[in-house]
């Protein structure tokens, strides 16, 4: 996990003692500046100078820094204290490992860590939340946890989970759970923000990297520069194949949009690759997305319309060239913004599916509408459908603070303009249109509208 990612409370915490200050010199004289060297070099130098001083130099004689005892040997560090290290009694439990073998071997559900976490917290009711693609494993995971953590009760959360923004700690808390295990997404909502103790399990998926490498070498000539991205499940693979591809003659860049991990993208958040140039100062030749489906890939394609994109599907083991209708999408979004500027009444939707909705972003738009004297009405919806919004025919423009891709992908299906927060601020003349550049996809970036802080609401 990268340094700038929201910190997870299940990592390795190091508790390092501070080094003791050196003892004061016995002779009051101006001391040379201390030099810090590697332990081996410093020890050798100190030993040599001690031997030399004892045989050839009188006390108080002028000496060089190396001979004056100014070399300070670094104190050996105490080994880090592993606060959450899974004990061997769990790792080597034969019965537990036999039960884990029922799950796919290339899927890392981190059962050992989960059991250790449950026991450490003395949790009694554990909520399990995962996307629909993993629900077929939910009952097996539940059975394993209840068998090896006697006395606990598990609750499988069956509501739709589209992404990391859908983590539902509110419902888990309301159901009396004291631990939420969220599978297959990264820590978009930090664990110090969630309302109950939370464990993120990325579900790292191992794939046949030899086929991936052979496919790339067959289709792309050495010397090409590649920006490699993917979902969190394949993040380890992306970093693992980088050195091999570089040895084969490719220049590999793993871009980052903080606070996501390097190489990780979301359907609403991806890096602008103009900030990640090659060693020769040029733009990368291509985007390579590792994963199934197009939803996340389209994010980085929208953000970087001039760079060709390819997708390697690790399940079908196929490499495909992907395209996107940038002009059509941008025309549709600009049309919606133009219509919104003449709307006499607005409707503001706060998404209530997990943590999708940001009340601070909603408040920011409210303040702008109040300043303009534009009437509006607030709604709270877990999912947004055209038929439901059509029932409020007096509302001439909608803004949904939930998922930007809902407006981008499906906005044309709604009877009235359905804007993202970014588009709403353009319509209210608080932000500039993207012009001839790329439509921004930075919703959960560090300064994105998905992370609006209360201070940003001040007018």
Curated annotation (Swiss-Prot):
Which Gene3D superfamilies does this entry report, sorted A to Z?
Answer: Diphthamide synthesis DPH1/DPH2 domain 1 (3.40.50.11840), Diphthamide synthesis DPH1/DPH2 domain 2 (3.40.50.11850), Diphthamide synthesis DPH1/DPH2 domain 3 (3.40.50.11860)
What GO terms fall under cellular component here? 2-(3-amino-3-carboxypropyl)histidine synthase complex; cytoplasm
Family indicated by similarity: Belongs to the DPH1/DPH2 family. DPH1 subfamily.
- Region of interest: Disordered: 1-68
Keyword Transmembrane helix appears in the UniProt entry: no
Q: What is this protein called?
A: 2-(3-amino-3-carboxypropyl)histidine synthase subunit 1
Q: What is its EC number?
A: 2.5.1.108
Q: Is Protein transport included in the keywords of this UniProt record?
A: no
Q: What GO biological process terms does the UniProt entry carry, in alphabetical order?
A: protein histidyl modification to diphthamide
Its recorded reaction(s) are: L-histidyl-[translation elongation factor 2] + S-adenosyl-L-methionine = 2-[(3S)-amino-3-carboxypropyl]-L-histidyl-[translation elongation factor 2] + S-methyl-5'-thioadenosine + H(+)
Where is the protein found, in the record's own terms?
Cytoplasm
Supply the source organism for this entry: Neurospora crassa (strain ATCC 24698 / 74-OR23-1A / CBS 708.71 / DSM 1257 / FGSC 987)
Q: Tell me, in a sentence or two, what this protein's role is.
A: Catalyzes the first step of diphthamide biosynthesis, a post-translational modification of histidine which occurs in elongation factor 2. Dph-1 and dph-2 transfer a 3-amino-3-carboxypropyl (ACP) group from S-adenosyl-L-methionine (SAM) to a histidine residue, the reaction is assisted by a reduction system comprising dph-3 and a NADH-dependent reductase, predominantly cbr-1.
Sorted alphabetically, the keyword list is: Cytoplasm, Iron, Iron-sulfur, Metal-binding, S-adenosyl-L-methionine, Transferase
Transmembrane stretches, start-end: none
CC cofactor note: Binds 1 [4Fe-4S] cluster per subunit. The cluster is coordinated with 3 cysteines and an exchangeable S-adenosyl-L-methionine.
Ranges in coiled-coil conformation = none
